[in-house]
């Protein structure tokens, strides 16, 4: 699996799947690309491209990590190894009602304001 993210400042960061004998420690290409960008100071991701054997979409963990650094309407393009055309998705379609620290803070403010 390979992935790349396009960032708000125009930079592109690529990532590859990093396998581990202990499967739970494997890191997906999408998260590698996102974390490379974040480690270089990027805070907002504008788009993501993923290439898998069959054109599959990012796993739930990768979707959640992307949601922390992208708006819900960010495009995610998924391609298979041998296909010329990919599928395009909005993050909000892949992860509706995503949890984020921002959404949690807003919920807490609403609860506080609603109770006064």
Each language-model region and where it sits:
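Hydrophobic "anchor" residues
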Residues: 11-12
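C-terminal binding/interaction regions
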Residues: 40-116
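Compact, glycine-rich, soluble single-domain proteins
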Residues: 17-31
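Short beta-strand scaffold segments in enzyme catalytic cores
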Residues: 1-7
């Amino acid at each position: 699996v390979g992935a790349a993210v396009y960032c708000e400042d125009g930079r592109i960061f690529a990532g590859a799947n990093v396998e581990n004998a202990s499967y739970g420690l494997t890191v997906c290409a999408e998260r590698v690309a996102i974390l490379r960008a974040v480690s270089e100071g990027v805070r907002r991701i504008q788009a993501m491209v993923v290439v898998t054997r069959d054109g599959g979409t990012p796993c739930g963990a990768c979707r959640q990590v992307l949601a922390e650094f992208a708006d819900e309407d960010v495009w995610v393009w998924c391609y298979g190894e041998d296909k010329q055309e990919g599928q395009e998705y909005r993050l909000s379609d892949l992860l509706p009602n995503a949890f984020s620290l921002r959404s949690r803070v807003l919920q807490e403010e609403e609860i506080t304001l609603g109770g006064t």
